[in-house]
Amino acid sequence: MDIDIVSVFPEYFDVLNLSLLGKAQERGLLAVRSHNLRQWTHDVHQSVDDTPVGGGAGMVMKPEVWAECLDELLGIPADAPANAHAAPAADSPVLIFPNPSAPLFTQQDATALSHAEHLVFGCGRYEGYDARIPQYYRERGVDVREYSIGDYVLNGGEVAVSVMLEAITRLLPGFMGNADSIVEESYTGENALLEHNQYTKPASWRGIDVPPVLISGDHGRVNRFRRDEALEKTSRLRPDLIARLDCHALDKQDRKTLMSLGWEVSGEHPRKLED
């Protein structure tokens, strides 16, 4: 996978050379390149922003600077005509902008993007980027995606890009030392739940014991305990995920556990009963 990141602080992404991401680059699983947006400016001050049209506080990132940069990284001629009906080619780059006003980035998005061959991330700053930038590239057949990583605002897109990048790349074949480690993680799979609690040795620590079933040696009971714990934990912390489950995919014990937690499971999806 090829990854290009555009930022006014490209050195922020030096951290990507550490840990598993760094090792994955050394092994050739992915190539990460960070670019300074100011490289595509032409004035002495290397300006990348200007005042908002219509007034208002702050500064907005200029479309002409971004366009020169993205034309080069995406391989699009500056005079490429608009085509409202153009569909992105299967192997074309995906252009991604973090945006606090955009849909929430999810594990499902990470999974889908892990199959792309080339990702280009644009890091906004100040009051954000001119809204015509994503519009322009969509009209030229680029797969443009905007994502939020939560209901809050950051100083720039660099943190959000780092979050998305790690979520995506760890799903690449060969990235993780043990591929099974991602199978039961939170939000994984169509019927996603929060992951069950994890424990390690010693079995008793400062007066707190691990659940006895986990040291019973009975793998069937262990699996059932973990499944029930995941259901309980998800019901308590993220009931919205329970409400998305397919009742037809639940086994008898799943149904029993959810009913004990106050869920109706006779329909297509579970429904929380009133207390």
From Swiss-Prot:
NCBIfam families registered for this protein in UniProt: PRK00026.1, trmD
Keyword set, alphabetical order: Cytoplasm, Methyltransferase, S-adenosyl-L-methionine, Transferase, tRNA processing
Gene that specifies this protein: trmD
Keyword RNA-binding attributed: no
Localization, UniProt: Cytoplasm
Name the record gives this protein: tRNA (guanine-N(1)-)-methyltransferase
Enzyme class at the top of the EC tree: transferase
Reaction(s) catalysed by this chain's protein: guanosine(37) in tRNA + S-adenosyl-L-methionine = N(1)-methylguanosine(37) in tRNA + S-adenosyl-L-homocysteine + H(+)
Organism of origin: Bifidobacterium animalis subsp. lactis (strain AD011)
GO MF annotation terms: tRNA (guanine(37)-N1)-methyltransferase activity
SUPFAM superfamilies: alpha/beta knot
Quaternary state and interactors: Homodimer.
GO cellular component: cytosol
PANTHER family, sorted: TRNA (GUANINE-N(1)-)-METHYLTRANSFERASE (PTHR46417:SF1)
EC number annotated for this UniProt entry: 2.1.1.228
Binding site for S-adenosyl-L-methionine: G124, I149, G150, D151, Y152, V153, L154
Gene3D superfamilies: 3.40.1280.10, tRNA(m1g37)methyltransferase, domain 2
A GO BP entry: tRNA N1-guanine methylation
Function: Specifically methylates guanosine-37 in various tRNAs.
Family to which this protein belongs: Belongs to the RNA methyltransferase TrmD family.
